[in-house]
Amino acid sequence: MTQVAEIKSPHEQRLEDNIAGKEDIYRESHKRVFKLLERFDGQKPAIDVERALYFTQSMAETVGQPLVLRWAKALMNVAKNITVMVQDDQLLLGRCGGHDGRYGILYPELDGDFLDIAVRDLPTRPQSPASISPEDAKIVVEQIAPFWKGRTYHEALNKALPAEVHKLTYDDPDGLISRFIVNETSSFRSSIQWVHDYEVVLKRGFNGLKQEMEEKLAALDPASPVDQVDKRPFIEATILVCDAIVLWAKRHADAARKAAEACADPVRKAELIRMAENAEHVPANPARDFYEAVQSQYFTQMFSRLEQKTGTTISNGRMDQYFYPFYKKDMEAGILTDEKTLEYLECMWVGMAEFIDMYISPAGGAFNEGYAHWEAVTIGGQTPDGRDATNDLTYLFLKSKREFPLHYPDLAARIHSRAPERYLWDVAETIKFGSGFPKLCNDEECIPLYVSKGATFEEALDYAVSGCIEIRMPNRDTYTSGGAYTNFASAVEMALYDGKMKKYGDVQLGIQTGDARKFKSWDEFWNAYVQQHMLLLRTTFIQQYIVIQTRAKHFAQPMGSVLHALCRKHCIDLHQPQIPEGLNFGYFEFMGLGTVIDSLAAIKKLVFEDKKLTMDQLIDALEANFEGYEDIQQLLRTAPCYGNDDEYADEIGRELDRMAVSFAAKYGKEMGINNDARYVPFTSHVPFGKVVSATPNGRVAWFPLADGSSPSHGADHNGPTAILLSNHNTKNYGMRARAARLINVKFTPKCVEGDAGTEKLVQFIRTWCDLKLWHIQFNVINADTLKKAQKDPQKYRNLIVRIAGYSAYFVDLTPDLQNDLIARTGHDQM
């Protein structure tokens, strides 16, 4: 019998060709950036300590001064002293230190109490390891860490949490070990994801912003306590930070001129001179052409990383919109080509990929495997006046993702009901390529929801995707506190074991709801679960309220603030809890939705309705982790499951969502924010699963939870459209205290083969859009390719896969997360 060859995605075929020694078909047209990429291919990132050192030196000298002014002075010290370098072949300037290749920087003000642990463990830890030289390690231990002992945000938060909240947050008195039940994320990022108003930099430059703030300074009332005590330090800080980034750029210009003087190659010499000219003009002044616009944005993006650890780095916003006027003008003038446009952009992509968003705490590393960072570029969508926004640049971004094999930056495509067929076709073709780009965000859900929460239509229509799959409205969003990740699968376990969890022995973590073996009805078990569920919600919101109050005393953001119209208008730092006219859109994560739905459905259906097993039999099987009880495990897997358009399971999911959203609506309002229910795990469904023992859906102990709002692994039997319908069925559309929902779908390349496959995928996307679901992302890959990469990681070094709102190199992931990806259902029919 003739064996049929396996259909491969273009990404898989490209890897196989490279393994076979064939020349990459795109190398010649992307020669420069391929050379840049090869310099750090497979390289473990290095820790660069310069930012932490110069930041710490300044902060030690300014103790007692207003925090926002101290922050600006520290940034000026960094700008003056940090190494500036010009990389061979690069066309852009702007690095956050002196390391060539992949590197990350430290933020001791955030989690400096972890520094000693980090220096010891980072090089060898399984999640996102990083190297550090002995000399730099000594600087960290002797010159940086001592100042921050007792001064870090993490230490302050650890002390501020009430005992009952602390117990569900941390597993040790010092807060160095996470419990993975109600996890705070604010101690490994000084704010959640963010998007700057890059357009104001391109149009006015930092000198223009500085002039605005100087005028505000001159207008202050000398007799006003508010003006002199609150506003003056803020204004002085914003002026200083404008000077700092301009100085930093000028130092890069000097370095480029020096490199040009020493360069014998006339072509490279001319490039270096032009790079110097760019850096002398931007970001101080408005950009005059496309190249300057790219350089100005890149300086702004990179200097933001020196300011503080913002979420998963600062997102890039709607690049195809704010770059388009420069692109159009230069194309019409005949001074720019599409090839050169891609070269400039891809030089930026490489620079962003080289910078690693370093998480030094063990919990931070577990949450963000594969060196996760999201500088999401948003394309498509609508203009502020409601017209389709796609343009020629939109298609160039998609082309770049198909041709240039790099996992950064992330690419997010906005979709709306009137999206052009050409755009949807190009999006589908890019998804089919197989590297996980782009993720999709739905205008039909996001825009009406944000208008209902207080945004104008113009503001909501202009949203940008930020972070994993959140959205931001530049100049209107003002909320920055890191959210909580709440493990609702632990509520199932605590309902089964009278408020205890196997992982934590006899510690009474939850409410004593009784011996579940003695429950005689579904109502009894449901009542026990609801009590544990509500305990987790209460803990989440108390924790987050303390986070909000504590952060304002430890963080300031003068650069982020000067780029925000409301901060400039009201002379208030972005980290303050309330900014006049701002909209505070925060969130907490509902972790393990599919696991919880399926577990509750199994108990309700099999134990109390069909009586196919008793609570004693169920708990005996769970306590044995199904060893010797494989028949019960298989029976549990026959129960109704989320992800199959099954009304029985979906009704339970809708009630779980209703409880979470109702709580958020009531107590978020009391806190003065929108602290809404969100279903986006990053990679945390893996470590959260490691604390949850066997669950009634047949999942074995310590196995990953269901991720985001996706089904449990192997539980989706009715095809991908049923996943969409279950997601729709479990949402409470009439309630507005809801936020993002992440959906992962895995197709085999055979499923989307050829033009017919592209058309099927386009129609699938239209169905998703019509259902008003927030997000969806795809892996188009064969499971065999992933298994081969596990066995021979060096050969598959460049295999890119979709994780949770971002793509990463498969071989950079831990075996647990690799296995999690392999276990996702690969649909071969649509």
Curated annotation (Swiss-Prot):
Q: Which family does it belong to?
A: Belongs to the glycyl radical enzyme (GRE) family.
Q: Which reaction does it catalyse?
A: 2-hydroxyethane-1-sulfonate = acetaldehyde + sulfite + H(+)
Q: In which pathway does it act?
A: Organosulfur degradation; alkanesulfonate degradation
Glycine radical: which positions carry it? G805
Please report the name of this protein according to its UniProt entry.
Answer: Isethionate sulfite-lyase
Quote the EC number: 4.4.1.38
Q: Where is the active site?
A: C468, E470
- The UniProt gene name for this protein comes to islA
Q: Does the keyword Transmembrane helix apply?
A: no
> Has the keyword Transmembrane been applied to this entry?
no
Q: What induces it?
A: Highly up-regulated in the presence of taurine or isethionate.
Note the Gene3D superfamilies from the entry.
3.20.70.20
User: What does the record say about PTM?
Assistant: Requires the activating protein IslB to generate the key active site glycyl radical on Gly-805 that is involved in catalysis.
Query: PFL domain: from which residue to which, for each copy?
Result: 31-700
Q: Name one Pfam family in it.
A: PFL-like
* Function of the protein: Involved in an anaerobic respiration pathway that converts the sulfonate taurine (2-aminoethanesulfonate) to ammonia, acetate and sulfide. Catalyzes the radical-mediated C-S bond cleavage of isethionate (2-hydroxyethanesulfonate) to form sulfite and acetaldehyde. Is not able to use any alternate organosulfonate or (S)-1,2-propanediol or choline as a substrate, showing that this enzyme is highly specific for isethionate.
Keywords, sorted A to Z: Lyase, Organic radical
Please describe the quaternary structure of this protein. Homodimer.
Which SUPFAM superfamilies did the record assign? PFL-like glycyl radical enzymes (SSF51998)
Single GO cellular component term: cytosol
A Gene Ontology molecular function term of the record: lyase activity
Its BP terms in the Gene Ontology are:
alkanesulfonate catabolic process
Instruction: Give start-end ranges for the coiled-coil region(s).
Output: none
Q: What else is known?
A: Taurine is an abundant dietary and host-derived molecule whose metabolism to hydrogen sulfide (H2S) by members of the human gut microbiota has many prominent connections to host health and disease. The human gut bacterium and opportunistic pathogen Bilophila wadsworthia produces H2S when respiring sulfite (HSO3-) released from organosulfonate substrates such as taurine and isethionate.
Question: In this protein, which residues make up the domain named Glycine radical?
Answer: 707-830
Instruction: Tell me which residues bind 2-hydroxyethane-1-sulfonate.
Output: R189, Q193, C468, I469, E470, R678
